[in-house]
Amino acid sequence: SKYFVNDPDWIIEQGSILDKNYINSLGKFDIVYSWGVLHHTGKMWSAIENAASLVKRKGTLFIAIYNDQGRKSSFWKKVKALYCSGIVGKVLITLVFIPYFVLRALLSSALKRKNVFAEYKKNRGMSIMYDWFDWLGGWPFEVATVEAVFHFLQDKGFLLSNIETSNGGLGNNQFVFTRE
């Protein structure tokens, strides 16, 4: 790592949230933050459980998990699987969806009388084009309802402190839990 190389209070490691032995070696923390990645592990519920196991009593867990939209989520799961299946799938999905995304963004720019391409990077931290490819390539792709995440963590001794939902749409439901 190039940051804090000689800092004795800064440790950088590489590990998997699915590796229980690695997780058990880390200890407990006041804050555990996993924003929009646990649903890309292929074992989302195990990943959530392992992340939660790192939170000490009275500690806080911040997670963001893709909202389950039923058929729409199933559709995107198929699209993403095809995109990640190899070069043919990647080209096919790119040829279908990137023009669709571009047209949608151009229409939005015209209706809002704003350049959504320029505004996007300021608000999201990445270019809109990069985000489109990031969305298409986000595999594995798992989803959960607000209720499922709430009950799963409630059963593990967590209280919901705050929530921001995707309002039933595409995107992440964002949760803040406190361990009792």
Predicted regions and their residues:
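A short acidic, Gly/Pro-enriched loop at the edge of an enzyme's catalytic core
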Residues: 18-32
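Conserved beta-strand signature within the Rossmann-like core of class I S-adenosyl-L-methionine
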Residues: 58-66
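Residues lining the SAM
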Residues: 35-38, 64
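Core SAM-dependent methyltransferase catalytic element
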Residues: 156-180
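A short, conserved alpha-helix within the catalytic core of class I
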Residues: 41-51
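Substrate-binding/catalytic lobe of Class I Rossmann-like enzymes that use SAM or dcSAM, i.e.
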Residues: 75-159
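Conserved SAM-binding strand-loop segment of SAM-dependent methyltransferases
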Residues: 5-20
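Conserved SAM-binding loop
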Residues: 1
